[in-house]
Amino acid sequence: MRVLLQRCYEASVSVEEEVISEIAGGLCLLVGFTHDDTPETVEYMAKKVVGLRIFEDESEKMNISLAERGGAILSVSQFTLYADVSKGKRPSFTKSAPGEKAERLYDLFNTKLSEAGFIVETGVFGAFMDVKIINHGPITMMLDSAEMRK
């Protein structure tokens, strides 16, 4: 599982030029799944996201988590996080989880974030979406469950 996490002032997602979800501040997450991801992977990553200390304290050090600071989450499914561009010029997506499995895990991930007490707005799984983000910092981090659980 990969999560591209961006700290943001605001973020929104539109489908067919209509805004369907938006947040006023917090985290924008682009979320992708691979074949061996499990519900346990999802739970681990949800805890990691809400516990990361990526907001500044009074000393301007990244020392405060979203759980401590408060804020909302915009979660957007993003199968292209598992694009393989090692051969040729066209990306391959064979490392991405099949749609049905990915959707199930994506829904579970958003449920876990909600259960942790956050307002979670989402995109539409499988839809072509426009995502607008006003990045704060900018702070952008790639979380990869395979790398973090070695």
From Swiss-Prot:
InterPro entries: Daa-tRNA_deacyls_DTD (IPR003732), DTD-like_sf (IPR023509)
Subcellular location per the Swiss-Prot or TrEMBL entry: Cytoplasm
Keywords on record: Cytoplasm, Hydrolase, RNA-binding, tRNA-binding
Highest taxon in the source lineage: Bacteria
Pfam families: Tyr_Deacylase
One GO MF term: Gly-tRNA(Ala) deacylase activity
GO biological process per UniProt: D-amino acid catabolic process
Cellular component aspect of the GO annotation: cytoplasm
Subunit (UniProt): Homodimer.
Function: An aminoacyl-tRNA editing enzyme that deacylates mischarged D-aminoacyl-tRNAs. Also deacylates mischarged glycyl-tRNA(Ala), protecting cells against glycine mischarging by AlaRS. Acts via tRNA-based rather than protein-based catalysis; rejects L-amino acids rather than detecting D-amino acids in the active site. By recycling D-aminoacyl-tRNA to D-amino acids and free tRNA molecules, this enzyme counteracts the toxicity associated with the formation of D-aminoacyl-tRNA entities in vivo and helps enforce protein L-homochirality.
Notes concerning its domains: A Gly-cisPro motif from one monomer fits into the active site of the other monomer to allow specific chiral rejection of L-amino acids.
Protein name: D-aminoacyl-tRNA deacylase
Gene source species: Listeria welshimeri serovar 6b (strain ATCC 35897 / DSM 20650 / CCUG 15529 / CIP 8149 / NCTC 11857 / SLCC 5334 / V8)
